[in-house]
A protein has these predicted regions:
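Metal-dependent catalytic neighborhoods of phosphoester/phosphodiester hydrolases
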Residues: 18-19, 50-71, 87-97, 121, ...
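N-terminal active-site segment of His-dependent metallophosphoesterases
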Residues: 1-65, 154
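Active-site-proximal beta-strand elements of phosphoester/diester hydrolases
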Residues: 3-15, 105-115, 144-148, 201-207, ...
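Active-site glycine-centered loops adjacent to acidic/histidine catalytic or metal-binding residues
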Residues: 10, 52-53, 83-84, 148, ...
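His/acidic metal-ligating clusters that form di-metal
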Residues: 32-47, 119-204, 238-240
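Alpha-helical scaffolding within the catalytic cores
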Residues: 31, 89-99, 131, 190
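Acidic/histidine-rich helix-loop elements
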Residues: 6-30, 56, 87-94, 117-125, ...
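Binuclear metal-dependent phosphoesterase catalytic core
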Residues: 2, 20-23, 31, 173, ...
C-alpha cells in the first residue's frame, strides 16, 4: 500500500523563552506541525522523518521538549537523525531513535552524516555498518534513505563545502546492502527546497521549520520565505513524490 511521511528538519529548538536569529523556533515548529496535522486529517500520515539540527541548544531537556511538542500534534513513529548542531548522546538520553521504520512495503533508513559541533559531513565506517545492519532488519520491497547533509550540490558555496562526499559510491553501496531496494533519499541542512538526482536516484532536500537560507547565495544569508516541510508520498511500486508546504508566520 502507499505510505505518507511527514519530513521536517532544522528546527533549531532553543531553551524556553529564547530566540535564534530573531526567530521563535518553537513557535515556527508548532506552526508547521499545526498545519501539517490538519492536512494529515484529510490525507493521513504514517510516520515522521526529523532529519537533524533539531536543537540549537543540544541538551537532553531541549530534545525532550522537542518530542513533547511533536506529540502534541502527532502519534506516529518518528525517525530522528542528528545534525551538526545536535549532540547524539543527548538525543539518545531523551529517547530519540535512529532505528529504522519498517512496514511490509517500505523501509525508512537513517544514515548518520554528522559529527557533533562540526558543520562538515562525516560518514564513518561504523555509520555505514549501522545503516547496513538496519537495512538487514526488514524485507520491505522499497527503501527510502534519510541523512542530514545534502547528497547533491545546492548551489550555495558556503553550504556545498559541507555536503556528503562521494554520494554516488555511497548510494551504490547502500543499494547493494539493501539488495537493490533503494528508491531515493531525503536530507536537511540546506534550509531550502532542493530536488536533484544521484545517479538514477531522486533526492529531496526540505526547507527548515524556522528560517531559510537564501538560494544560490555565495555566503550566509537569510531568505524571506516562511517555515516549511514536505510530504513524501511513497507508492506501492517504489516511486517517491514530494510536496513542499510553507506556513505564514
Amino acid at each position: 500500500m502507499a505510505r505518507r511521511v511527514l519530513h521536517i528538519s532544522d528546527c533549531h529548538l532553543v531553551a524556553p523563552g529564547e530566540t535564534l536569529l530573531q526567530t521563535d523556533t518553537e513557535a515556527t515548529l508548532r506552526a508547521v506541525l499545526n498545519q501539517a496535522v490538519d492536512e494529515a486529517a484529510q490525507d493521513g500520515c504514517d510516520a515522521i522523518i526529523a532529519s537533524g539540527d533539531l536543537a540549537h541548544t543540544p541538551t537532553t531537556p531541549v530534545y525532550e521538549r522537542f518530542l513533547h511538542i511533536v506529540s502534541d500534534y502527532f502519534n506516529v513513529p518518528m525517525l530522528s537523525l542528528p545534525g551538526n548542531h545536535d549532540v547524539l548522546q543527548a538525543m539518545q538520553q531523551a529517547g530519540m531513535s535512529m532505528a529504522p521504520i519498517v512496514w511490509a512495503d517500505w523501509h525508512l533508513q537513517a544514515l548518520d552524516s554528522h559529527e557533533d559541533d562540526r558543520p562538515k559531513s562525516l560518514i564513518t565506517e561504523l555509520d555505514r555498518q549501522a545503516a547496513a545492519q538496519g537495512l538487514a532488519q526488514g524485507a520491505a520491497h522499497w527503501v527510502l534513505l534519510a541523512t542530514h547533509h545534502p547528497l547533491v550540490l545546492v548551489d550555495c558555496p558556503w553550504l556545498d563545502k559541507d555536503r556528503i562526499v562521494g554520494p554516488l559510491e555511497l548510494m551504490n553501496w547502500l543499494n547493494a546492502a539493501s539488495q537493490q531496494r533503494l528508491c531515493g533519499a531525503v536530507f536537511g541542512h540546506a534550509h531550502q527546497e532542493v530536488a536533484g538526482r544521484v545517479g538514477a536516484w531522486p533526492v529531496f532536500g526540505v526547507p527548515s521549520t524556522c528560517f531559510q537560507f537564501r538560494p544560490r547565495s555565495p555566503k550566509f544569508a537569510i531568505d524571506d520565505k516562511g517555515p516549511g516541510y514536505q510530504w513524501l508520498d511513497l507508492s506501492k511500486d517504489g516511486k517517491i513524490s514530494r510536496t513542499v508546504r510553507r506556513v505564514a508566520v
